[in-house]
């Protein structure tokens, strides 16, 4: 056959494919992010993630280039205007920048994560998540097209499927700690609510990134400027694009 072998790896239930023979191994590529998250969850904890069969997936369509979705995910600058509900309890000033070195990922973290689910029910947490970090959650874009969210009680991967230069399919996969949290009737209402929350938040971004696509087509657009205070992670991604794609 004419099939050619390509390198692939599985990490956090995601399959990563590398068609370039001149790139480093995936283990080396992912090590900076994996090491960073060791302070939250151990390797044993990571093995506990289970995908939810009922409320573990949704997809969104965006009429824009995939890179705008990554740009948007990297920064918290837009929170007050795009996500007023989220910003009411996780304000822009509660976030911090993440700039992975070497330049392979970037994003933001929050210091006030506190699940806003109805009633007294709560999801089980990762057993080794430090008590002094229980209100920390991190949202990282792993270049080129994967967005990740790690919390004490659930994890998600939000990956982009570029259809063409101005149309992108977004796929959200949600995981919980153990099969009981992910699939039992006991936690079904909580899963439904968490699913609704994340779909609502991510849907709020679609109009914005589609507007970014339209804005780039304006003859008045001159390339734009980065905020030296708020756009550091986004600038990190732009540097990756220049180095690896352009």
Predicted segments, located by residue:
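Active-site glycine-rich loop that binds ribose-phosphate moieties when present
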Residues: 1-4
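C-terminal catalytic domain of Rieske-type non-heme iron oxygenases
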Residues: 9-10, 14-246
């Amino acid at each position: 056959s004419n099939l050619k072998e390509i390198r692939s790896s599985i990490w956090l239930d995601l399959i990563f494919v590398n068609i370039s023979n001149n790139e480093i191994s995936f283990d080396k590529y992912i090590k900076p992010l994996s090491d960073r998250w060791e302070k939250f969850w151990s390797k044993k904890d990571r093995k506990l993630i289970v995908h939810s069969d009922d409320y573990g997936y949704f997809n969104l369509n965006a009429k824009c280039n995939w890179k705008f979705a990554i740009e948007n995910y990297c920064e918290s600058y837009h929170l007050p205007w795009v996500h007023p509900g989220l910003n009411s309890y996780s304000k822009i000033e509660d976030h911090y920048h993440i700039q992975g070195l070497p330049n392979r990922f970037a994003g933001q973290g929050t210091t006030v994560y506190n699940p806003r689910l109805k009633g007294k029910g709560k999801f089980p947490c990762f057993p080794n998540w430090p008590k002094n970090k229980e209100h920390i959650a991190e949202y990282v874009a792993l270049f080129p097209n994967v967005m990740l969210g790690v919390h004490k009680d659930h994890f998600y991967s939000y990956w982009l499927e570029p259809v063409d230069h101005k149309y992108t399919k977004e796929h959200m996969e949600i995981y919980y700690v153990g099969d009981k949290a992910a699939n039992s009737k006991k936690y079904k209402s909580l899963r439904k609510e968490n699913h609704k929350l994340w779909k609502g938040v991510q849907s709020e971004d679609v109009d914005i990134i589609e507007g970014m696509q339209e804005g780039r087509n304006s003859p008045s657009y001159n390339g734009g400027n980065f905020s030296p205070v708020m756009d550091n992670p986004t600038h990190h991604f732009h540097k990756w694009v220049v180095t690896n794609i352009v």
